[in-house]
Amino acid sequence: MIKQDVQKCVDALQDFVDKEIGESVNLFSCKSRANNELLLNIDEKFQLKDKDELHQLGEQKIENQNKLQEIRNKVEYYEKLLTELEEAQKELEVRYKLVSKSK
């Protein structure tokens, strides 16, 4: 009798485990299909660049950064030049005033 009760418990436990495994497998399958569909949609929307094109874009980026740095250097040079010209203009104004007063 105990053996039968134990067997019933084992059978009930096995049924429960089988049911849970079935539900888990079903849920996993549904999520896998949904993820696969999502990946397909993403793949359609966003085309990946090939290695050559990515390399070319990288080189273009470096070239653009170098050009930008050159422009920044020129701007800095012209700003310094402007400051020097403003100082020279002030000196000339002072000299002009001194010359005008001495006449």
UniProtKB/Swiss-Prot annotation:
Component of the biogenesis of lysosome-related organelles complex-1 (BLOC-1). Its main location: other. One of its GO terms (cellular component) is endosome. Residues 51-102 form a coiled coil. This is Biogenesis of lysosome-related organelles complex 1 subunit BLI1. Keywords: Coiled coil, Endosome, Transport. Component of the biogenesis of lysosome-related organelles complex-1 (BLOC-1) involved in endosomal cargo sorting. It is found in: Endosome. Belongs to the BLI1 family. InterPro entries: BLI1 (IPR020491). It comes from the Eukaryota. It holds the Pfam family BLI1.
